[in-house]
Amino acid sequence: MAEKKKTIEKFVKEQIKKWEGMYLKKPEKAQTRLPVVTVSSEPGSGGTAVAQEIAKRLDFDYFHRGIVEGIATSAEIRSTVIDSIEKERLSGIEDFIASLVRDNYIYPGIYLEHLLLVVGTIGKHGNAVIVGRGANFILPPDERFSIRVIAPLELRVQNVAKWHKVPEEKARQRVIQRESKRRAFVRQSFNASITDPHNYDLVINTGRMKIESSAESVIGALMAGLGKDT
C-alpha cells in the first residue's frame, strides 16, 4: 500500500509540474486546451488499451482508475491536485458539483465528494484521458467527450483468460463480477446506468474494431465535434 502511495505521489508531482509548465508558456506556444476524454468500458473489452492509445496520439495526460482513486482517497495528494487550480476555477467546480448533487438526487459520502473534486480539477486542466470512476457523470458536457467501449461477452472472457493466464471459467467469473461492481458503483453514486448508450457521446465495439482504429474513430469524432481537422 505504501509503495502504491509513493507511485501515485510521484505521478502527481510530475503532473503538477507539467500543468505549471503549460501555464508558463507564451500564448503562441501554449497547447490548446481540449476536453477530457472519459472512457467507460466493459471488463475485458480493451477499454484501457483504447484509452492509452488515445492519450498517446493526442499527447494527453492519462489517468487510469487506480490513479484517480488513489488521489481521491489520500488527503495529502488530493489537496496537492486541488491546489493546482485558481480559487475562482475551484469555486466553479464546487458550484457544478452542488448542481450535480441537486439535479441528479445524489447523496455523496466522503469518498464521492473527494472523487467529484479530483475529477473536476482534472477537467479544468483539460487535455487528459480518464478511465473509469464515472468521470463522464461528473464532468459537464462542455468539458468532456465520453466514450463507452464494449465487446461480446465471449470475446471479453477470452481476452481476460489470455491477459491474466487463467482458465476461461475463472475469467468469466472475473468479468461478470467486475461488471456487476461497476454497474453498482455508477447506479449508487450517480443514480445512472453505466450501460445506457445515451450517457455517452460515442460507443465503440472492439469486437468489430481493432484498438488502433477504435482510437482513430474517437479522435476523429472528438475533432469533428470541435470543428478541427485530425
State what each model feature region is.
Residues G92, P167-I211:
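Small-molecule kinase domains that catalyze NTP-dependent phosphoryl transfer to phosphate-bearing small molecules
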Residues T38-A55:
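Glycine-rich phosphate-binding P-loop
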Residues D61-T73:
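Short beta-strand-centered segment that lines the nucleotide-binding/catalytic pocket of NTP-utilizing
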Residues T32-V37, G126:
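Pre-Walker A (Motif I) flank of P-loop NTPase domains
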